[in-house]
Amino acid sequence: MSYLGVGVSPGNVPVYHGTNSKVIDRRVRLAELVLRCVICCLGVLAAVLVGTDTQVKEIFSIQKKARFTDMKALVFLVAANGIAAAYSFVQGVRCVVGMVKGSVLFSKPLAWVIFSGDQMMAYLTMSAVAAAAQSSVFAKLGQPDLQWMKICTMYGKFCNQVGEGIASALLVSVSMVVLSCISAFSLFRLYGGNKGKDGARW
């Protein structure tokens, strides 16, 4: 060990312990923060697009109003994206606080909580998108065998806005899957050989 406190390899090459870990940690936290902001914004957008979507159509002198509550899958989509947006906002605040404090590593219990939460949100958003997409296909194409008519031929504006909401929700679910992979990396690297070298926990 030199007087500068820098480890020296047999080849007289200085080795700075923990530097790579800190760089990787900063990049991971930045990617996590960006994804959480994206999920928060797109989740709110998807919920607003679908939740505020209505269209009135007059059929045989009778006015029929299409709402997202007419399809339970769309109600599930709005709720799931609202929950995902709120969850991502809270986690985003946590990321900002951690970056301001300059923390490098966090405790394993907290890492498990974040990992589990991200996994749950990923499954929730993916299932909501899948259910909404299936219902939208029936609304668009109908189901002749069950004598279900093509709803979108009458409520074109309503279906178009729902489609935009589902597209936003799809981006949310994809981002959530990527984020769950990042949280898995952040968790399981704590069990690697480099854990505890930097000594900062939060």
UniProtKB/Swiss-Prot annotation:
It comes from Populus trichocarpa. It is a multi-pass membrane protein. The keyword Cell membrane applies. The chain crosses the membrane at residues 30-50, 73-93, 110-132, 165-185. Homodimer and heterodimers. This is CASP-like protein 2B1. Belongs to the Casparian strip membrane proteins (CASP) family. Residues 1-29, 94-109, 186-202 are cytoplasmic.
